[in-house]
């Protein structure tokens, strides 16, 4: 209640939240603007046929894009190219020590260089994906004539409808770049991580369809396995609560390392030592590993689906990487564990912490300062990270288990248990932390201003 009251009282916070809300609303507008020359209603009908035949990959892609994928709108690619580009750049950083040094010495300049690289890769990946998307739309048009307007198919160059290809590539790439820009603006001038908020908004927008699926299949007295009976509803509710509580515990959980301070001289006074603790987060990476792993698996699988009819080996790869398959689940778990460790290694710097502790005469009881402290922090963080990574992976594969156990629609299992819930809860918690941090800074500023005023008098 206090935070809510301060929201209405603090003008700057109110402006940030309204700015964020306005940009996120603009994102949703793009869901209803189809790519020129494509009939969105017929496209949705085609995708429903695919979902009926078990093509769960498109269901996952549609959830991530907030319904834009199935309607073939201008933002159908979503932020997946941007996330894939971020993964590529972060992996490149491991082999670019010069850029890593620049990041440490001048973080602003290093971030600008990384931002430019990420944008370049985003454009390249968006162009590739939109080309494949256009090719897939032409294949859809053979099944349901009218998905692509005939006027765009009349002009051909070497047998290729070049006007349709150029239009689709330009429009869809622009849509992805617009989402990327909106995400960056929210991160800079609004509240929360912009890209994560866009993904979370897309997931939340699927809630009405999830609720509709549950209501349509709800039959408490039925013995039919295709209906949702009382036991199935109870299991879904328990899984939802379990995922919610477990996600909060994983993201908020910390391992407290005891820290002691020796006697220090501040000015002319000798300050006695005291005790404190160093919090090491159980899941330092948050929901980043889940977003990265989902996007990375979605990229090759989507390409495989788009060109599967022309290549038998690509068709096999697409089938193997379909959400819910054994290979997909194994790759998903391994990627989540890998990205959890990878992101933690890039963001957590034990050598800096050990150096700062030594400067401030702080030490961990039983551990010498300097290198021994650094090694101890690395060892402890590795053990804690393993626990967090395994929990993330276990929750992320819940949709597959739910789908097999309860035979519910894939959109229901994805939303109520697993990846979608992890992302939404993680993004909400992160945004709340940023609001609290902003309020804390405001409180400190007001205290400092009061002290300065008293000093003048």
UniProtKB/Swiss-Prot annotation:
The keyword Nuclease does not apply. GO terms for cellular component: plasma membrane. SUPFAM superfamilies: Preprotein translocase SecY subunit. The chain crosses the membrane at residues 18-38, 75-95, 117-137, 162-182, 195-215, 231-251, 287-307, 319-339, 386-406, 412-432. The keyword Protein transport applies. It is found in: Cell inner membrane. Keywords: Cell inner membrane, Cell membrane, Membrane, Protein transport, Translocation, Transmembrane, Transmembrane helix, Transport. One of its GO terms (biological process) is protein targeting. It is a multi-pass membrane protein. InterPro entries: SecY, SecY/SEC61-alpha, SecY_CS, SecY_dom_sf. It holds the Pfam family SecY. Belongs to the SecY/SEC61-alpha family. The central subunit of the protein translocation channel SecYEG. Consists of two halves formed by TMs 1-5 and 6-10. These two domains form a lateral gate at the front which open onto the bilayer between TMs 2 and 7, and are clamped together by SecE at the back. The channel is closed by both a pore ring composed of hydrophobic SecY resides and a short helix (helix 2A) on the extracellular side of the membrane which forms a plug. The plug probably moves laterally to allow the channel to open. The ring and the pore may move independently. HAMAP family: SecY. Component of the Sec protein translocase complex. Heterotrimer consisting of SecY, SecE and SecG subunits. The heterotrimers can form oligomers, although 1 heterotrimer is thought to be able to translocate proteins. Interacts with the ribosome. Interacts with SecDF, and other proteins may be involved. Interacts with SecA. This is Protein translocase subunit SecY.
